[in-house]
């Protein structure tokens, strides 16, 4: 775990991030404080991609070491949530001990995105404000329009897949099939959308340790709405019932 945290922290610091704290095996970080960072959305997203690339290399290294590590280490994954917006930063704590940290709704949503990424079976979930600031420099999946736990307003979210020009093998077909299914879903064509999501599910990369994927999570939604149509006033959002 210390090796993993060292590798991830090195990437964070090399890409202009500020380390807030470690919470167990989690890394909390931000950009733009205490010193301003130009293009901070790009640096945050680049950090996330580089972390995933390095973790993939580490998995191979750990697996090559055989029985030194349990099999769960060979398939170690992480999740990252990214959001952009105002936050409060500064020294916070008691008169005996303080920590330079951050707080606010922006931070809360980023934490919710990290947690809910597991429901989609993805590594990196990014809010729209961050995505649109560097949209042309990365490959994205138009993931969802959701109300996360603890919020009342829906948020547009994306899966960050890779840097532009580095499309993973087969992902062009996956994204095309997925986008077609989402379009049918948003137009309330539930039966056709269900068939389309099942087709895109067949294309999804079910790598070791992955239990679901974005295509698969839409299928029960289509079944639900087929039996309980949301009506003409539906904004396309879905309320998550767990973090």
Predicted regions and their residues:
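Cytosolic regulatory/linker segments at or just downstream of nucleotide-handling modules
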Residues: 87-89, 116-192, 198-231
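Catalytic NTP-binding/metal-coordinating core of nucleotidyl cyclase/transferase enzymes
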Residues: 1-47, 97-100
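Catalytic strand-loop-helix junctions within cyclic-nucleotide turnover domains
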Residues: 30-40, 80-100, 117-120, 161-164
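Cytosolic nucleotide-binding catalytic cores of signal-transduction proteins
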Residues: 7-8, 25-27, 48-55, 78, ...
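A short beta-strand->alpha-helix segment at the C-terminal rim
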Residues: 53-86, 109, 114-145
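Helical mechanochemical/support elements of P-loop NTPase systems and associated helical scaffolds
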Residues: 4, 23, 40, 47, ...
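Hydrophobic, well-ordered secondary-structure elements that form the walls
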Residues: 8, 44, 51, 82, ...
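Intrinsically disordered, low-complexity, charge-biased linker/tail regions
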Residues: 230-243
């Amino acid at each position: 775990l210390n090796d993993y945290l060292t590798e991830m922290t090195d990437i964070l610091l090399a890409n202009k991030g500020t380390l807030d704290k470690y919470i167990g095996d989690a890394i909390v970080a931000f950009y733009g404080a205490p010193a301003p960072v130009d293009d901070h959305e790009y640096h945050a997203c680049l950090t996330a991609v580089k972390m995933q690339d390095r973790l993939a290399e580490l998995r191979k290294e750990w697996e090559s070491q055989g029985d030194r590590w349990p099999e769960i280490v060979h398939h170690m994954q992480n999740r990252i949530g990214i959001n952009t917006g105002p936050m409060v930063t500064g020294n916070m704590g008691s008169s005996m001990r303080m920590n330079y940290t951050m707080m606010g709704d922006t931070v809360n949503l980023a934490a919710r995105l990290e947690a809910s990424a597991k429901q989609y079976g993805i590594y990196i979930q990014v809010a729209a404000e961050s995505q649109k600031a560097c949209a042309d420099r990365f490959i994205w999946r138009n993931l969802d329009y959701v109300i996360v736990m603890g919020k009342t307003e829906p948020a547009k979210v994306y899966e960050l897949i890779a840097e532009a020009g580095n499309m993973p093998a087969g992902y062009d077909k996956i994204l095309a099939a997925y986008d077609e299914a989402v379009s049918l879903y948003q137009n309330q064509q539930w039966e056709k959308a269900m068939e389309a999501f099942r087709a895109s599910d067949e294309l999804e990369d079910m790598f070791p340790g992955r239990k679901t994927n974005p295509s698969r999570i839409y299928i029960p939604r289509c079944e639900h709405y087929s039996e309980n149509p949301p009506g003409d006033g539906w904004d396309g959002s879905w309320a998550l019932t767990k973090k």
